[in-house]
């Protein structure tokens, strides 16, 4: 009897060990020692020394995990259960960046490219297809070189928005740049998806103000605008990040700003009826305001215990001018908002970027050196979705939306106004297409903490809630297709069921990939999708740079390629 029990325990232990081994192998895609030695030797031969290999039992992993975790902004993808890269490479020059790509190719590794790590779905540092992958992290490629004579700047792909803003402000107090409000976002990915911000109604997106770029392609070539060709240059501006090659640097156009701008954040909490009426008026006003004015809304639910008590509506305003001018414009166009002089603060443009940032303790907007901080303190677990609105939503429709919002205290919804320059620029000017006819963009967001993430039912509940919110809004937003913003990536829209690896040339498979990607591609890029497929086929016919929601090439036209290293 004892012997039978002992044998049963032994079998159980063996089974548990096998399960543990299988689970671990799923997290770190299997890679042969030969492949690992190949890429390590290749990197060393190319004098790339700043890299870290996934830790084994005989290799301490502190440096690896410090590198990996530093720029993971969505903690959903930092969990031990998520796949991990075999190697993390941190190139420190364009030569090392080129070498990193060639070594990954030689070792048959998938490549993930990370700039600031703000990918909403973790696609810059996670791969879910089971293949060994490498993260090329651009954090050391963060130089910003400003040339006031030409009113341009070369910005390396690993620089953050905050570093870029700070460098511009050190060179001039009458120049700025049109991009997002979160200073730790990397410019490489942000501009690749378009890049919307407080100056976008005046000057368009970040990508609208790119005049040249340096792109490392899958063959290790460093291509400028002329060398890559106009179609590829068009595609990399708004066509999404991580799928064309690696942006070594953007050449951006500096934009004129006055020495004094006005900023305000005014809370307007109240009942659903009160907030609905304010929001209804906002959507009629904000897209039609002067080009110099930006006015957005952020809403969440306040509750006492589990009982909703009111909706918190927060209006963020930015004006390229004095507060007297700003208040005069608002009093005429939107008196219901009730903004008064004491709500407004006059400051420089660079101070406004800190004022609207998500950095902690920014009451002192004169300490703009904080914009250079690369580490984002307010990391969280989150899920987001997006929409575009073409016709005003009725008060009843807004009330319905707030009915869903009040169910989840961790939920948020943000309305960003379009119009002005966003209305005038052609939807074909760059790959980002959401222009004329769009009143505003919606971002749905739900954020939670680690204790809730450890509770599967709770974390799944947050995801279910945001999907419910999204479904509820369907009658009120764009349709055929229901448009989305690629920088707010949402894998719910669909994923590639396979990445159609390097050795396929079957037209049927190519057609399948292109049509499969159309499901999300037309939501992000509307009528620009097919043009993006052609650009992808030109610059990356082997689909080396890919992720779950990439743009596939037309494989039937693939050329033969051979690659070698030292």
From Swiss-Prot:
UniProt modified residues of type Pros-8alpha-FAD histidine: 118
Top-level taxon: Eukaryota
Glycosylation sites: 50, 364, 378, 503
Major localization class: other
Residue intervals of the FAD-binding PCMH-type domain: 81-257
GO-annotated molecular function: FAD binding; oxidoreductase activity
Cofactor(s) needed for function: FAD
InterPro entries, A to Z: BBE, FAD-bd_PCMH, FAD-bd_PCMH-like_sf, FAD-bd_PCMH_sub1, FAD-bd_PCMH_sub2, Oxid_FAD_bind_N
Enzyme class name: oxidoreductase
GO cellular component: vacuole
Function: Involved in the biosynthesis of pyridine alkaloid natural products, leading mainly to the production of anabasine, anatabine, nicotine and nornicotine, effective deterrents against herbivores with antiparasitic and pesticide properties (neurotoxins); nornicotine serves as the precursor in the synthesis of the carcinogen compound N'-nitrosonornicotine (NNN). Catalyzes a late oxidation step subsequent to the pyridine ring condensation reaction in the biosynthesis of alkaloids.
Protein name in UniProt: Berberine bridge enzyme-like D-2
Organism for this UniProt entry: Nicotiana tabacum
Lineage: Eukaryota, Viridiplantae, Streptophyta, Embryophyta, Tracheophyta
